[in-house]
Amino acid sequence: MLKTIRKHGITLALFAAGSTGLTAAINQMTKTTIAEQASLQQKALFDQVLPAERYNNALAQSCYLVTAPELGKGEHRVYIAKQDDKPVAAVLEATAPDGYSGAIQLLVGADFNGTVLGTRVTEHHETPGLGDKIELRLSDWITHFAGKKISGADDAHWAVKKDGGNFDQFTGATITPRAVVNAVKRAGLYAQTLPEQLSQLPACGE
């Protein structure tokens, strides 16, 4: 009887150990898969705001943290694109704080000479059917920033048409596009200051 109990006890212990090991392995595989998927999604988003042929470094690994009013409150990530180890452009996280329904989060690609290379909205709470046209799936409006140059802080072209600029507003919704245009302009101007700052910026994860 005692031998039987011991035998069952050992069997249960081995089963428990095996189950624990299997669970740990599955969890690790799941974490790896999620991380890989997130990395692919991030790369796809980068490619929408910065043409892949413009750089040849691992963009996600060239990440810096900045605290700059031009990008909005708090810390924002900035990714430096390099061609043969020379900084040539950046992808910047930016916040438009003055959307109709709150802050609008953006990703802006820009070179260091004042040209915006692409822009995408990553998060917003704008009104469906009105301000949400800043989303690429609903309108191509957000693509109209690509290739546009900013000629200084006083460049009047960088405004919605209602304010005398070059960018369309939406029917019944001017606040949202105005907020995005202004935020992209600020980010593009800030990008021009990055080369001289790089040696002083903390890397992401430090």
Swiss-Prot record:
Subcellular location: Cell inner membrane
Membrane topology: Single-pass membrane protein
Keyword Zinc: no
Single GO term (MF): FMN binding
Modified residues annotated as FMN phosphoryl threonine in this record: 174
UniProt key word Iron: no
The enzyme's E.C. designation: 7.-.-.-
One BP annotation, GO: electron transport chain
Parts of the chain that traverse the membrane: 9-29
GO CC terms: plasma membrane
Domain of life according to the entry: Bacteria
Enzymatic class: translocase
Keywords from the UniProt entry: Cell inner membrane, Cell membrane, Electron transport, Flavoprotein, FMN, Membrane, Phosphoprotein, Translocase, Transmembrane, Transmembrane helix, Transport
Residues in the signal sequence: none
Oligomer status and interactors: The complex is composed of six subunits: RsxA, RsxB, RsxC, RsxD, RsxE and RsxG.
Chain's role: Part of a membrane-bound complex that couples electron transfer with translocation of ions across the membrane. Required to maintain the reduced state of SoxR.
Similarity remark: Belongs to the RnfG family.
Protein's name in the database: Ion-translocating oxidoreductase complex subunit G
Organism from which the protein derives: Escherichia coli O157:H7
